[in-house]
Amino acid sequence: MARVKRGVVARARHKKILKQAKGYYGARSRVYRVAFQAVIKAGQYAYRDRRQRKRQFRQLWIARINAAARQNGLSYSRFIDGLKKASIEIDRKILADIAVFDKVAFAALVEKAKSALA
């Protein structure tokens, strides 16, 4: 039986990992063994943070809506409750955008929420 030499396969695998580790600091971008660990860890962080990003953006939107609602004399929870009672269905992403870029429209939404609560 012929001897199987795997130099080509190993070289390709190493090149692939080192390409993924491009831009990393020091040995992490040059030494295969270290680069492999760095790439694996980076993948774990990326996987985790893709899920965290959704939570963090929702937190940001809620903080912005709360700040804008309080400037108009209403807490976040009462504002959201008022919108639901007024059957206004705008998601938090759009509400936060309106709160930042169109203060007049947001004030009108707060007034509708207040009237629905009363």
UniProtKB/Swiss-Prot annotation:
One of its GO terms (molecular function) is rRNA binding. Pfam families: Ribosomal_L20. Signal peptide: none annotated. One of its GO terms (biological process) is translation. GO terms for cellular component: ribonucleoprotein complex; ribosome. Keywords: Ribonucleoprotein, Ribosomal protein, RNA-binding, rRNA-binding. InterPro entries: Ribosomal_bL20, RIBOSOMAL_L20_CS, Ribosomal_protein_bL20_C. CDD domains: Ribosomal_L20. Belongs to the bacterial ribosomal protein bL20 family. PANTHER family: 39S RIBOSOMAL PROTEIN L20. Binds directly to 23S ribosomal RNA and is necessary for the in vitro assembly process of the 50S ribosomal subunit. It is not involved in the protein synthesizing functions of that subunit. This is Large ribosomal subunit protein bL20. It comes from Photorhabdus laumondii subsp. laumondii (strain DSM 15139 / CIP 105565 / TT01).
